[in-house]
Protein backbone atom coordinates (compact mmCIF):
# COMPACT_ATOMS: atom_id res chain seq x y z
CA UNK A 1 0.00 0.00 0.00
CA UNK A 2 1.38 3.39 -0.95
CA UNK A 3 1.70 6.18 1.58
CA UNK A 4 -0.56 9.21 1.78
CA UNK A 5 2.44 11.45 1.01
CA UNK A 6 3.04 9.53 -2.21
CA UNK A 7 -0.63 9.88 -3.16
CA UNK A 8 -0.53 13.63 -2.49
CA UNK A 9 2.65 13.98 -4.54
CA UNK A 10 1.05 12.11 -7.42
CA UNK A 11 -2.07 14.28 -7.24
CA UNK A 12 0.11 17.39 -7.15
CA UNK A 13 1.92 16.27 -10.29
CA UNK A 14 -1.40 15.70 -12.04
CA UNK A 15 -2.56 19.15 -10.94
CA UNK A 16 0.57 20.74 -12.37
CA UNK A 17 0.00 18.99 -15.68
CA UNK A 18 -3.62 20.13 -15.62
CA UNK A 19 -2.73 23.76 -14.98
CA UNK A 20 -0.25 23.87 -17.86
CA UNK A 21 3.36 24.93 -18.21
CA UNK A 22 5.00 26.06 -14.98
CA UNK A 23 5.39 29.78 -14.46
CA UNK A 24 8.85 31.02 -13.51
CA UNK A 25 10.08 34.53 -12.71
CA UNK A 26 12.57 34.58 -15.57
CA UNK A 27 9.69 34.26 -18.02
CA UNK A 28 8.20 37.71 -17.36
CA UNK A 29 9.23 41.14 -18.56
CA UNK A 30 8.42 43.72 -15.87
CA UNK A 31 5.94 45.36 -18.26
CA UNK A 32 4.13 42.04 -18.80
CA UNK A 33 2.82 41.67 -15.23
CA UNK A 34 0.69 44.81 -14.70
CA UNK A 35 -1.26 43.14 -11.89
CA UNK A 36 2.02 42.83 -9.96
CA UNK A 37 4.04 45.83 -11.16
CA UNK A 38 2.29 49.04 -12.21
CA UNK A 39 3.11 50.30 -15.71
CA UNK A 40 4.69 53.42 -14.17
CA UNK A 41 6.95 51.33 -11.92
CA UNK A 42 7.76 48.98 -14.81
CA UNK A 43 8.93 51.96 -16.86
CA UNK A 44 11.10 53.25 -13.99
CA UNK A 45 12.57 49.78 -13.50
CA UNK A 46 13.40 49.43 -17.19
CA UNK A 47 15.19 52.79 -17.12
CA UNK A 48 17.17 51.53 -14.11
CA UNK A 49 18.25 48.41 -16.03
CA UNK A 50 15.67 45.96 -14.67
CA UNK A 51 14.05 44.13 -17.59
CA UNK A 52 12.53 41.01 -16.00
CA UNK A 53 11.00 39.86 -12.75
CA UNK A 54 14.10 37.73 -12.27
CA UNK A 55 16.28 40.86 -12.64
CA UNK A 56 14.11 42.63 -10.09
CA UNK A 57 14.42 39.83 -7.56
CA UNK A 58 18.20 39.70 -8.05
CA UNK A 59 18.65 43.47 -7.79
CA UNK A 60 16.26 43.90 -4.84
CA UNK A 61 17.00 40.76 -2.82
CA UNK A 62 19.41 42.42 -0.38
CA UNK A 63 18.58 45.52 1.65
CA UNK A 64 21.63 47.48 0.44
CA UNK A 65 20.90 46.61 -3.19
CA UNK A 66 17.24 47.65 -2.75
CA UNK A 67 18.40 51.03 -1.44
CA UNK A 68 20.64 51.48 -4.48
CA UNK A 69 17.82 50.46 -6.83
CA UNK A 70 15.46 52.84 -5.03
CA UNK A 71 17.89 55.66 -5.73
CA UNK A 72 18.40 54.78 -9.39
CA UNK A 73 14.74 54.02 -10.15
CA UNK A 74 12.92 56.56 -8.01
CA UNK A 75 10.78 53.78 -6.50
CA UNK A 76 10.73 53.61 -2.70
CA UNK A 77 12.67 50.83 -0.98
CA UNK A 78 9.47 49.60 0.70
CA UNK A 79 7.69 49.31 -2.63
CA UNK A 80 10.71 47.52 -4.07
CA UNK A 81 10.58 45.04 -1.18
CA UNK A 82 6.90 44.38 -1.93
CA UNK A 83 7.70 43.87 -5.62
CA UNK A 84 10.65 41.62 -4.80
CA UNK A 85 8.41 39.50 -2.56
CA UNK A 86 6.03 39.04 -5.48
CA UNK A 87 8.91 38.06 -7.76
CA UNK A 88 10.14 35.65 -5.10
CA UNK A 89 6.81 33.79 -5.20
CA UNK A 90 7.05 33.62 -8.99
CA UNK A 91 10.00 31.23 -8.54
CA UNK A 92 7.54 28.48 -7.58
CA UNK A 93 6.51 26.27 -10.48
CA UNK A 94 2.89 26.90 -11.38
CA UNK A 95 2.59 30.29 -9.66
CA UNK A 96 1.85 33.22 -11.94
CA UNK A 97 0.72 36.76 -11.18
CA UNK A 98 -2.85 35.78 -10.28
CA UNK A 99 -1.73 33.19 -7.74
CA UNK A 100 0.84 35.60 -6.27
CA UNK A 101 -1.99 38.03 -5.56
CA UNK A 102 -4.10 35.25 -4.07
CA UNK A 103 -1.27 34.06 -1.82
CA UNK A 104 -0.60 37.65 -0.73
CA UNK A 105 -4.27 38.07 0.14
CA UNK A 106 -4.03 34.86 2.17
CA UNK A 107 -1.06 36.26 4.11
CA UNK A 108 1.85 34.60 2.26
CA UNK A 109 4.45 37.11 1.09
CA UNK A 110 7.51 35.05 0.19
CA UNK A 111 8.87 31.62 -0.65
CA UNK A 112 10.25 31.34 2.90
CA UNK A 113 6.78 32.00 4.36
CA UNK A 114 5.14 29.54 1.96
CA UNK A 115 7.63 26.83 2.95
CA UNK A 116 6.47 27.12 6.58
CA UNK A 117 2.78 26.65 5.75
CA UNK A 118 0.70 23.49 5.64
CA UNK A 119 -2.24 22.71 3.39
CA UNK A 120 -4.68 22.43 6.29
CA UNK A 121 -4.01 26.02 7.32
CA UNK A 122 -3.32 27.66 3.97
CA UNK A 123 -6.13 26.20 1.88
CA UNK A 124 -8.96 27.76 3.93
CA UNK A 125 -7.07 31.09 4.00
CA UNK A 126 -6.74 31.01 0.20
CA UNK A 127 -10.44 30.18 -0.18
CA UNK A 128 -11.47 33.03 2.16
CA UNK A 129 -9.13 35.48 0.43
CA UNK A 130 -10.55 34.59 -2.97
CA UNK A 131 -14.15 34.83 -1.75
CA UNK A 132 -13.41 38.30 -0.39
CA UNK A 133 -11.21 39.69 -3.16
CA UNK A 134 -12.45 37.69 -6.18
CA UNK A 135 -8.91 37.29 -7.56
CA UNK A 136 -9.37 34.18 -9.68
CA UNK A 137 -12.15 32.20 -11.33
CA UNK A 138 -10.39 28.94 -10.49
CA UNK A 139 -8.74 28.85 -7.05
CA UNK A 140 -6.04 26.23 -6.52
CA UNK A 141 -6.97 22.78 -5.25
CA UNK A 142 -5.43 21.42 -2.06
CA UNK A 143 -3.12 19.26 -4.18
CA UNK A 144 -1.79 22.34 -5.99
CA UNK A 145 -1.21 24.17 -2.72
CA UNK A 146 0.60 21.10 -1.35
CA UNK A 147 2.82 21.06 -4.45
CA UNK A 148 3.67 24.76 -4.02
CA UNK A 149 4.56 24.27 -0.36
CA UNK A 150 6.82 21.34 -1.22
CA UNK A 151 8.47 23.33 -4.04
CA UNK A 152 9.02 26.27 -1.68
CA UNK A 153 10.82 23.99 0.77
CA UNK A 154 13.31 23.07 -1.99
CA UNK A 155 14.22 26.64 -2.95
CA UNK A 156 16.94 28.66 -1.25
CA UNK A 157 15.95 31.80 0.63
CA UNK A 158 17.17 34.70 -1.51
CA UNK A 159 15.14 37.61 -0.18
CA UNK A 160 16.46 39.67 2.73
CA UNK A 161 13.44 41.25 4.40
CA UNK A 162 15.01 43.25 7.23
Predicted regions and their residues:
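C-terminal extensions
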Residues: 4-5, 10-162
Amino acid sequence: MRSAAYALSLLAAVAVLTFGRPALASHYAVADVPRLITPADAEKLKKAGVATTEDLLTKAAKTKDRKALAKSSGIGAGTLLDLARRCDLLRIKGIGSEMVLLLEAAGVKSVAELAKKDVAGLSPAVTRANQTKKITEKPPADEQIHFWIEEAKKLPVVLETK
